Amino acid sequence: MLARMLNTTLSACFLSLLAFSSACYFQNCPRGGKRAISDMELRQCLPCGPGGKGRCFGPSICCADELGCFVGTAEALRCQEENYLPSPCQSGQKPCGSGGRCAAVGICCSDESCVAEPECHDGFFRLTRAREPSNATQLDGPARALLLRLVQLAGTRESVDSAKPRVY
């Protein structure tokens, strides 16, 4: 009788510990366990935007070098698929701000929002071949500086409400 009660109590304790543990036994964990995420190579995030020219930066953010960033718009809908992929991804060229990466000229994006960032001006030069027609106006000197300053000012005067769809 005592042995039976001891077995029942021991079984109940074991099952309780198993139920309350948050190990990778029954949860959706990466291959190799939770610590294996830091060992995994980051893949390029999904393409998005017009013509697939952009890359996802978050579930509702799509940025392209030439087009800027789309936040909460139809161009960023494909980025919601990233939530269902098992491996982590990374977009952008260099780190900026607090946990973000440079997404376009003067724009730093994290997975939640985008802000104007002066340190994101370097490294975004569109390279075109001589044979390739360009539909963009090439700005140099004062005109470029003025345009970038206007983008920065527009970014600092935005409201905190990030629920509205925006194009940067």
UniProtKB/Swiss-Prot annotation:
<dbReference type="GO" id="GO:0042711">
    <property type="term" value="P:maternal behavior"/>
</dbReference>
<dbReference type="GO" id="GO:0007621">
    <property type="term" value="P:negative regulation of female receptivity"/>
</dbReference>
<dbReference type="GO" id="GO:0031394">
    <property type="term" value="P:positive regulation of prostaglandin biosynthetic process"/>
</dbReference>
<dbReference type="GO" id="GO:0042310">
    <property type="term" value="P:vasoconstriction"/>
</dbReference>
<dbReference type="GO" id="GO:0033574">
    <property type="term" value="P:response to testosterone"/>
</dbReference>
<feature type="signal peptide">
    <location>
        <begin position="1"/>
        <end position="23"/>
    </location>
</feature>
<dbReference type="GO" id="GO:0005185">
    <property type="term" value="F:neurohypophyseal hormone activity"/>
</dbReference>
<dbReference type="GO" id="GO:0043066">
    <property type="term" value="P:negative regulation of apoptotic process"/>
</dbReference>
<dbReference type="GO" id="GO:0030425">
    <property type="term" value="C:dendrite"/>
</dbReference>
<dbReference type="GO" id="GO:0014049">
    <property type="term" value="P:positive regulation of glutamate secretion"/>
</dbReference>
<feature type="disulfide bond">
    <location>
        <begin position="48"/>
        <end position="62"/>
    </location>
</feature>
<dbReference type="GO" id="GO:0003084">
    <property type="term" value="P:positive regulation of systemic arterial blood pressure"/>
</dbReference>
<dbReference type="InterPro" id="IPR000981">
    <property type="entry name" value="Neurhyp_horm"/>
</dbReference>
<keyword id="KW-0838">Vasoactive</keyword>
<keyword id="KW-0839">Vasoconstrictor</keyword>
<dbReference type="GO" id="GO:0007204">
    <property type="term" value="P:positive regulation of cytosolic calcium ion concentration"/>
</dbReference>
<dbReference type="GO" id="GO:0035094">
    <property type="term" value="P:response to nicotine"/>
</dbReference>
<dbReference type="GO" id="GO:0035176">
    <property type="term" value="P:social behavior"/>
</dbReference>
<keyword id="KW-1015">Disulfide bond</keyword>
<keyword id="KW-0372">Hormone</keyword>
<feature type="disulfide bond">
    <location>
        <begin position="109"/>
        <end position="114"/>
    </location>
</feature>
<feature type="disulfide bond">
    <location>
        <begin position="24"/>
        <end position="29"/>
    </location>
</feature>
<keyword id="KW-0165">Cleavage on pair of basic residues</keyword>
<dbReference type="GO" id="GO:0046718">
    <property type="term" value="P:symbiont entry into host cell"/>
</dbReference>
<dbReference type="GO" id="GO:0051970">
    <property type="term" value="P:negative regulation of transmission of nerve impulse"/>
</dbReference>
<dbReference type="Pfam" id="PF00184">
    <property type="entry name" value="Hormone_5"/>
</dbReference>
<dbReference type="GO" id="GO:0031895">
    <property type="term" value="F:V1B vasopressin receptor binding"/>
</dbReference>
<feature type="disulfide bond">
    <location>
        <begin position="96"/>
        <end position="108"/>
    </location>
</feature>
<dbReference type="GO" id="GO:0035556">
    <property type="term" value="P:intracellular signal transduction"/>
</dbReference>
<dbReference type="GO" id="GO:0008284">
    <property type="term" value="P:positive regulation of cell population proliferation"/>
</dbReference>
<comment type="subunit">
    <text>Interacts with vasopressin receptors V1bR/AVPR1B (Ki=85 pM), V1aR/AVPR1A (Ki=0.6 nM) and V2R/AVPR2 (Ki=4.9 nM). Interacts with oxytocin receptor (OXTR) (Ki=110 nM).</text>
</comment>
<dbReference type="GO" id="GO:0005615">
    <property type="term" value="C:extracellular space"/>
</dbReference>
<feature type="disulfide bond">
    <location>
        <begin position="63"/>
        <end position="69"/>
    </location>
</feature>
<dbReference type="GO" id="GO:0002125">
    <property type="term" value="P:maternal aggressive behavior"/>
</dbReference>
<dbReference type="GO" id="GO:0007625">
    <property type="term" value="P:grooming behavior"/>
</dbReference>
<comment type="function">
    <text>Vasopressin has a direct antidiuretic action on the kidney, it also causes vasoconstriction of the peripheral vessels. Acts by binding to vasopressin receptors (V1bR/AVPR1B, V1aR/AVPR1A, and V2R/AVPR2).</text>
</comment>
<dbReference type="GO" id="GO:0031894">
    <property type="term" value="F:V1A vasopressin receptor binding"/>
</dbReference>
<dbReference type="GO" id="GO:0050891">
    <property type="term" value="P:multicellular organismal-level water homeostasis"/>
</dbReference>
<comment type="similarity">
    <text>Belongs to the vasopressin/oxytocin family.</text>
</comment>
<dbReference type="GO" id="GO:0045907">
    <property type="term" value="P:positive regulation of vasoconstriction"/>
</dbReference>
<feature type="modified residue" description="Glycine amide">
    <location>
        <position position="32"/>
    </location>
</feature>
<dbReference type="InterPro" id="IPR022423">
    <property type="entry name" value="Neurohypophysial_hormone_CS"/>
</dbReference>
